[in-house]
Design a protein with these regions (language model features):
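Non-catalytic alpha-helical scaffolds and adjoining flexible linkers that form interface surfaces
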Residues: 1-20, 25-139
Length: 139
């Protein structure tokens, strides 16, 4: 089963010398987990940051199994906020919250739209109040 989608990186863990296991929340497929080969190369490693938006090509052998992912950066989101610890903490907090609260392969467009809204909220002046409302919507 092959498909293409866009999604946000929720987590990434080193798998072996050249690969990583990554978890994404996608628009049409929900939360997915897969292996990214060559993720330790300088080219890919530099943008595999939690919160960045990717274009994902997935190759699954069977439904419910760990698949192979090819990723291309779509939008760089997180590095913009590296100098602001509060905003960076809120991004990572939201990603972990979604990682914990959602089930694999269950599509929920509302959650994806909340992730899109998160990065719009963080740019506002009163972002902290809006972030609290966003958090309540996620829960």
């Amino acid at each position: 089963m092959n498909w293409q989608d866009k999604g946000y990186l929720l987590s990434v863990n080193k798998y072996n010398e050249n690969s990583s296991i990554a978890e994404f929340y996608t628009e049409n497929n929900g939360k997915i987990v897969g292996v990214i080969f060559g993720s330790t190369s300088k080219k890919i490693k530099s943008y595999l940051l939690i919160g960045n938006k990717f274009h994902i090509n997935s190759k699954l052998r069977e439904d419910g199994r760990l698949g192979y992912l090819k990723v291309e950066i779509d939008e760089i989101k997180t590095p913009v906020y590296l100098e602001n610890k509060k905003k960076l903490f809120c991004i990572i907090y939201c990603m972990n919250l979604i990682k914990i609260l959602t089930a694999e392969n269950e599509n929920n467009v509302e959650i994806y739209n909340l992730l899109e809204k998160l990065f719009k909220i963080i740019e506002l002046d009163n972002w902290l109040v809006e972030f609290l409302y966003l958090e309540l919507n996620i829960l």
